[in-house]
Amino acid sequence: MPISCTGLLRLLHLFLLLSSTLAAEDPIISRFQQYLQINTAHPSPNYHQAVDFILSQAKSLSLQSQTIEFAPNKPLILLKWTGKNPTLPSILLNSHTDVVPVEPHKWSHPPFAAAIDSANGNIYARGSQDMKCVGLQYLEAVRNLKRFNFEPLRTIYISFVPDEEIGGHDGAEKFANSEVFDEMNVGIVLDEGLASPDESYRLFYAERCPMWLVIKAAGAPGHGAKLYDNTAMENLLKSIESVRRFRASQFDLVKAGLKAEGEVISVNMVFLKAGTPSPTGYVMNLQPSEAQAGFDIRIPPIADQASLERRIAEEWAPASRNMTFELGQFKQKMSVYDENGRPILTAHDGSNPWWALLEGAIDKSNRRFGRPEIFPASTDARYFRLKGVPAIGFSPMANTPILLHDHNEFLNKEEYLKGIEVYESIIKAFASFAAETEKDEATKDEL
Ligand SMILES: [Zn+2]
């Protein structure tokens, strides 16, 4: 017998009710569901509801809290657990509260219901991977540590920032450049990473820097029937071919397994603009005098940005071929180097004790981790690294398909719970770390 639409809806409702009842048995999971159910998707994230929820959690954990608006209606929450030696550089656990938009009809479960599939324990929701999981895992780890009367030596800050998904300019960027941040004397930041389809966690020490390139070609206009040199279209096509060859050379390195995705320069054409519009389409018997193309480029800090810029000026948009170019990202050019000319990355060798502490803590929780990687896209961690503060990208999600920004984003219940255990181990290791780091030495010099 066919089931009617209302019948289906009723069944769905019953299913949701059942899954939330099941979850209610586990307060940890039910808190995660509550956070996921707050719709903080762009373009109109409900930040205030998220703030209320986080603040109520902070209160239950007796953490000090403050809400700061670096931009109107874009609240950032800063929680504090004061250490026994607050003069030591502190630990910052960062996460963003916003999520990317959804196309609900393409989801198997409603994206803000946080329904649990009872067959396998998967929790479906936008933000389940990116990155409400991490934000609440920090808090759950703190809850457990407090229950066992753990007392941190170093002060622990937990920040919940807005707007990461739209560039972080009114969130982490303003925060990292604020007096509030300076006063926190942060020694290490933990921020987001990516899920890993295999059993090893992924750790990120840097990220690629976005560079948006627009190249423009000019040439004499002419009749569509005429063959002549140096048309705008021909000039642009030569450049596109050159860019395409470069892209293939980089992609081949990844395909051959010689480099990871984050270690090569990616170049992707994102628009192509040319032609003379007519009421019915385009004028067909006219060769246009202008043509342009746009490219999204991502450069790892281990690449030679200056040589890429030379390649752009000499090969991709040479003045000799009547070409010009604009380089930018959010109207300003980004660089893989900081103001002192050093590549923006966090050391992942013996010179950075935090890295060894992190690996040791993961080891202790009986989990594996892979080779340190460069994050292929951008996260808020870059703003902290730019300030010279080490930042490690890590989201404890192994055996999980990468579904950030995708339909049917989910995280398994057991994987979420395991992640809390791992953060307990990390926070314990970081907050108990008594030895002096380079930053500690510098702080002492100032005193
Ligand atoms: Zn994210």
Regions found by a protein language model. Give the residues of each.
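Cleavable N-terminal signal peptides of Sec/SRP-targeted secreted and luminal proteins
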Residues: 5-23
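Metal-dependent amide/peptide-bond hydrolase catalytic core
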Residues: 23-27, 65, 85, 194-199, ...
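Predominant activation on well-ordered alpha-helical scaffold segments within soluble catalytic domains
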Residues: 33, 55, 136-139, 143, ...
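Short beta-strand segments
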Residues: 94-96, 160, 189-193, 216-218, ...
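Short, conserved micro-motifs enriched in small and acidic residues
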Residues: 123-136, 165, 230-233, 410-417
